[in-house]
Amino acid sequence: MSGRSTFGRFGPPSSEPWERKPGDDEGGPKRPKVERPDTNDLLKRMRRVDPNQSRRYRQRTGE
């Protein structure tokens, strides 16, 4: 034997590859907590830029 461990240079695998924070019950990426834009405000801004585009958007989304 060459004196190396069976795990190589990385060491033994840990049971959990990351540290859990207290209160972190769910795994995976989190969705940022931001408020949704007001659709009326969005349509007003679209109307200023291109009136036809705001009309098409309203038809497509059912507004």
Swiss-Prot record:
Where in the sequence does UniProt note compositional bias of the Basic and acidic residues kind?
17-50
Q: Name one Pfam family in it.
A: UBact
**Residue numbers spanned by region Disordered:** 1-63
Q: What's in the keyword line of the UniProt record?
A: Isopeptide bond, Ubl conjugation pathway
Q: Which GO terms describe its molecular function?
A: protein tag activity
Query: In terms of domain of life, where is this protein from?
Result: Bacteria
Positions of crosslink type Isoglutamyl lysine isopeptide (Glu-Lys) (interchain with K-? in acceptor proteins): E63
Functional summary from the UniProt entry: May function as a protein modifier covalently attached to lysine residues of substrate proteins. This may serve to target the modified proteins for degradation by proteasomes.
**Family, per the entry?**
Belongs to the ubiquitin-like protein UBact family.
**Which protein, by its recorded name, is this?**
Prokaryotic ubiquitin-like protein UBact
Q: Supply the source organism for this entry.
A: Handelsmanbacteria sp. (strain RIFCSPLOWO2_12_FULL_64_10)
